[in-house]
Amino acid sequence: VAAAPGYGSKLARSGFGAPSLPRWCVWVQPSAAGDADRWERRWLQGVNAALDSWAKLLPIVRVGDPRRAHVRVERRRPPLRQLSGGWRASNGRSLLQVMEVKRDDRSLLEPRVTVLVSPELRALALRATALHELGHAFGLWGHSDNPVDAMAPVQGASPVLEPSEDGHLTLEWIRRQPTGFGQPVPPEIRSDDT
């Protein structure tokens, strides 16, 4: 891991390896009513722009059914998080679950990520937040030390709207690492042996 490019050595891993897939199915929460209002349109534009940025670097398939998605992007403010010094608010959050799913009569291990992006942000901050949280969802479960990187925990004065070269290198590296995700579930952890 020490020879990892970019900030690959700082990424968290699961016991199954990096939560990465060859192709990601993504669902984005549609507007509540048929026609999106101004605020919903702004949110959708920011999230879609962030998805388009990542789609230049890895295969993404947008799906209309959230049950088919590996990544679900939801329009809501993340709940407060309790830290040692008190409570902390955030603009976005990515929540990873490890799922056993049936595909073509096979049990596979897949990541399911719920991405929360607050609708109450300025347009550029919303897009930058979506870009950052989607980076986590696609396997970058860590942060860059560079404040002008989309994966920095706190960005500089201007919102970062595209993945950096370090982010690109790190993503390519993580996608080449061995992983149990997308593979048959090992018999010792299967929930149903039938």
Name the predicted role of every residue range.
Residues 14, 143, 153-154:
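Surface-exposed loop/turn and secondary-structure junction residues enriched for glycine/proline
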Residues 19, 144-147:
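Short, compositionally biased low-complexity segments
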